[in-house]
């Protein structure tokens, strides 16, 4: 009688209609449960969680920008407004933590001094929400004159040399560019 659903917000080409499609799917799950549950007296709890898209190296979306934290929160609010059933719980990832993840996923050597400054200011175990203190990272970025948006909300050009281009994973840029094009066209790549 418990269902957990996990979605990602902020993917390239995502629209408000896509976000509302999540709510529609959740209500279809509830309806399917009502139509098929053996013991309806126990009720249904649907836990919905959304993550904030982080463009990662060696993926077709490595060139994409991350939506702003404000836009992510707007989409979270839009979704939450459409969850009117008491059986739905909704949580979303911290935009600050996801932005920091994007910075370090796409970062370069300029981030070394930022990490050092953050650690010296007491940043520890920052992958855990209960320990994460964005202000320490914010101060470290400012002290090192590094702008986070250079790594997050800026898209990369297809011809741009990326910090991870020196690493050979056995799959070239051409493959990722082809997959990116297929994604934008809504095509599935067969196995």
Regions found by a protein language model. Give the residues of each.
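Short secondary-structure subsegments characteristic of cysteine-rich extracellular domains
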Residues: 63-75, 82, 186, 190-191
């Amino acid at each position: 009688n418990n269902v957990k659903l996990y979605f990602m917000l902020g993917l390239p080409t995502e629209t408000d209609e896509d976000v509302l499609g999540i709510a529609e799917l959740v209500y279809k799950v509830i309806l399917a449960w009502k139509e098929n549950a053996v013991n309806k007296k126990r009720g249904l709890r649907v836990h919905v969680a959304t993550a904030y898209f982080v463009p990662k190296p060696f993926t077709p979306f490595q060139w994409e920008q991350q939506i702003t934290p404000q836009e992510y929160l707007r989409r979270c609010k839009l979704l939450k407004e459409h969850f009117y059933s008491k059986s739905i719980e909704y949580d979303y990832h911290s935009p600050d933590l996801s932005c920091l993840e994007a910075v370090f996923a796409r970062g370069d050597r300029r981030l070394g001094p930022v990490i050092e400054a953050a650690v010296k200011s007491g940043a520890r175990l920052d992958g855990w929400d209960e320990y994460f203190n964005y202000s320490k990272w914010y101060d470290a970025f400012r002290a090192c004159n590094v702008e986070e948006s250079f790594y997050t909300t800026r898209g990369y050009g297809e011809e741009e040399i990326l910090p991870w281009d020196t690493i050979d994973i056995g799959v070239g840029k051409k493959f990722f560019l082809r997959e990116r094009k297929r994604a934008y066209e809504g095509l599935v790549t067969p196995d």
